[in-house]
């Protein structure tokens, strides 16, 4: 399978247009039920005097019925304002269905300082090394007299740092525990915990004159209840509490972030093809809310917010998957 894309922007009064090119090839392999592919992209951005060409090889293998190995490896050549540099990166994931109830994923991601591939809309992340695992366990309840039909548990452990280890180095943990009831209602609990400290990267950005900022331990707890989804009107209640940031003896320097929220919403389902979603309100209150102002400058505010939203889902046709 082949794919090709090319685009040229017109010049404006104030800048020259960009030029894009991309080529994609993908092949199926009979051995290991695998797939391999190749992607190259080229971008010329004369308005900022930058050219970049990326070459990426991706793969997807299934060593067994229950396991899968997939990812990609790539390099990029960049010439910006007369400076030439080359970057490398890769991403690898391995999944295995241990039992019908237990699913496990392992991942390893790496991108060096020069692996800046944001020219064609990729996620901008470089100078990063992350490793972790994800586990999901579903346990059906065979006791028909119980109101609980199934319990669901998921867990994720993540370590993330810069390539040289000067930033990051913290360890974060996520877990999600949910009860599914026989009437199709559900009750779920979630927690994000940063339980090993690291060096903050977002606010310092390797700026030489920036202060050393340590990312402290913290946690955010969330709970959500959904009424039976088989009813024409479903109600959803949710609440959360979190505490992160930096705490000092000086009140003016105290950047400890305390937050809490609660909300209520409805889902109206008059038919199988139409759905109306109304978030009546979500109240949020947060101290020392951090917001990016410009490079290496953040503002901190006490935030209080009430928000509402409305959306409509309409399925055209009668076939749904």
Go through the PLM ranges and name each one.
Residues 50-52, 68, 72-321:
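Exposed, low-structure sequence patches enriched in small/polar residues
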Residues 1-50, 58:
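A conserved hydrophobic secondary-structure block that centers on an alpha-helix together
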Residues 30-32, 62-64, 99, 182:
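Short strand-coil-strand connectors
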Residues 57-59, 312:
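Intrinsic disorder/low-complexity signal
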Residues 6-8, 27-29, 40-44, 63, ...:
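Short, flexible loop/turn elements at secondary-structure junctions
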């Amino acid at each position: 399978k082949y794919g090709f894309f090319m685009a040229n922007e017109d010049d404006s009064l104030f800048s020259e247009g960009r030029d894009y090119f991309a080529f994609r090839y993908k092949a199926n392999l009979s051995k290991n039920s695998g797939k391999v592919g190749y992607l190259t992209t080229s971008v010329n951005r004369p308005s900022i005097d930058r050219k970049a060409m990326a070459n990426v090889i991706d793969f997807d293998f299934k060593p067994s019925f229950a396991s899968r190995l997939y990812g990609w490896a790539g390099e990029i050549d960049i010439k910006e304002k007369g400076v030439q540099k080359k970057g490398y990166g890769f991403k690898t994931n391995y999944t295995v269905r241990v039992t019908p109830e237990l699913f496990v994923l392992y991942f390893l991601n790496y991108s060096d300082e020069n692996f800046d591939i944001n020219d064609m809309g990729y996620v901008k992340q470089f100078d990063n090394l992350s490793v972790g695992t994800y586990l999901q366990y579903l346990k059906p309840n065979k006791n028909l007299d119980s109101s609980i039909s199934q319990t669901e548990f998921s867990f994720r452990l993540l370590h993330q740092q810069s390539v040289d280890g000067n930033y990051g180095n913290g360890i974060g943990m996520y877990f999600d525990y949910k009860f599914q009831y026989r009437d199709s209602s559900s009750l779920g609990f979630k927690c994000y915990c940063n339980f090993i400290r690291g060096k903050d990267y977002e606010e310092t950005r390797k700026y030489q004159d920036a202060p050393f900022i340590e990312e402290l331990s913290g946690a955010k707890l969330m709970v959500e209840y959904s009424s039976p989804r088989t009813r024409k009107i479903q109600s959803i209640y949710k609440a959360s509490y979190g505490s992160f940031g930096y705490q000092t003896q000086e009140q003016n320097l105290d950047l400890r972030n305390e937050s809490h929220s609660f909300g209520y919403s409805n889902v109206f389902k008059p038919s199988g093809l139409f759905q109306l979603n109304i978030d009546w309100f979500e109240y949020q209150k947060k101290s020392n809310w951090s917001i990016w102002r410009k490079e290496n400058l953040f503002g901190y505010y006490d935030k209080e917010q009430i928000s509402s939203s409305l959306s409509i889902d309409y399925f055209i046709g009668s076939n749904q998957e």
